[in-house]
């Protein structure tokens, strides 16, 4: 006698720790393509929601793909809830977004989650651009972050250029960087970690990161590795979140995450690889 297949609706949903909402590439190590392996290294289950799906990053001679259609994107988010997968989610992680409409949709979706789970972590890397390239996201993204997403963030990881874009304040010195970061603390926001903070002030061969909270500001310093693959910010954000979920204080989590990125950069340089090679076991 053939047994009937169990009704999926009667089975327990897959427990999800992290909803990671960012880019996805077929080839390369950026967005969720690098974040998911990092999260998995911490033993975390991830629902990876793509914002754009690309063959590779735009710095290659050819690229295919684009932003996920908005109705698909909203459907991905809605169906996570419909499957009952969000009950135990510990953090929502945001990276590269495909445009302001996605930011607005995300704002509504996250606000609904936070209304039910006021303690839910929302970690946002407000991807806008950098000092070398300028703005490389869709027009209107700065305003979209300000209007729809920053009020929901518990933590932010802008680089110095993005901090300046979001606040409209100078960030040339470390003091200015810390002051600008503090203007983003309010409401839900507990910390801002500024990567590539005040680069004009760095000693030769060093890189600085500012970790800013309501009560404290620490400047971390690490070696500069002479290679520049894409995806280091995405890797840092995932590693940071992993260490925070493991119970580390924010400054220590940032230090450990930076160390993981440095190890990956050193491995990448030694291999002569054009894409980021993930480092070894977690520390």
UniProtKB/Swiss-Prot annotation:
It catalyses: pyridoxal + ATP = pyridoxal 5'-phosphate + ADP + H(+); pyridoxine + ATP = pyridoxine 5'-phosphate + ADP + H(+); pyridoxamine + ATP = pyridoxamine 5'-phosphate + ADP + H(+). One of its GO terms (biological process) is pyridoxal 5'-phosphate salvage. The keyword Nucleotide-binding applies. Substrate binds at residues 23, 59, 234. Its cofactor is Mg(2+). The keyword Translocase does not apply. It holds the Pfam family Phos_pyr_kin. Homodimer. This is Pyridoxine/pyridoxal/pyridoxamine kinase. It comes from Bordetella parapertussis (strain 12822 / ATCC BAA-587 / NCTC 13253).
């Amino acid at each position: 006698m053939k047994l009937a297949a169990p009704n999926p609706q009667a089975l327990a949903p897959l427990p999800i720790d992290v909803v990671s909402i960012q880019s996805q590439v077929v080839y390369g190590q950026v967005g969720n393509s690098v974040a998911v392996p990092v999260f998995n290294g911490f033993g975390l289950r991830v629902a990876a929601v793509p914002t754009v799906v690309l063959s590779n990053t735009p710095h290659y001679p050819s690229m295919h793909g684009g932003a996920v259609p908005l109705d698909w994107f909203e459907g991905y988010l809605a169906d996570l809830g419909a499957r009952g997968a969000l009950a135990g989610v510990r953090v929502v992680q945001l990276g590269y977004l495909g445009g302001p409409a996605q930011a607005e949709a995300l704002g509504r979706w996250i606000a609904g989650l936070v209304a039910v789970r006021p303690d839910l972590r929302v970690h946002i890397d407000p991807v806008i651009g950098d000092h070398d390239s300028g703005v490389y996201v869709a027009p209107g993204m700065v305003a979209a972050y300000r209007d729809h997403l920053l009020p929901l963030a518990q933590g932010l990881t802008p680089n110095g250029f993005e901090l300046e874009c979001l606040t409209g304040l100078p960030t040339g010195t470390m003091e200015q960087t810390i002051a600008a970061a503090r203007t983003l603390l309010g409401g839900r926001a507990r910390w801002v970690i500024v990567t590539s903070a005040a680069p004009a002030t760095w000693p030769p061969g060093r890189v600085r990161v500012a970790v800013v909270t309501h009560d404290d500001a620490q400047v971390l310093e690490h070696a500069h590795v002479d290679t520049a693959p894409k995806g280091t910010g995405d890797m840092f954000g995932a590693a940071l979140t992993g260490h925070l979920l493991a119970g580390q204080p924010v400054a220590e989590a940032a230090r450990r995450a930076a160390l993981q990125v440095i190890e990956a950069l050193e491995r990448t340089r030694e291999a002569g690889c054009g894409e980021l090679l993930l480092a070894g076991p977690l520390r």
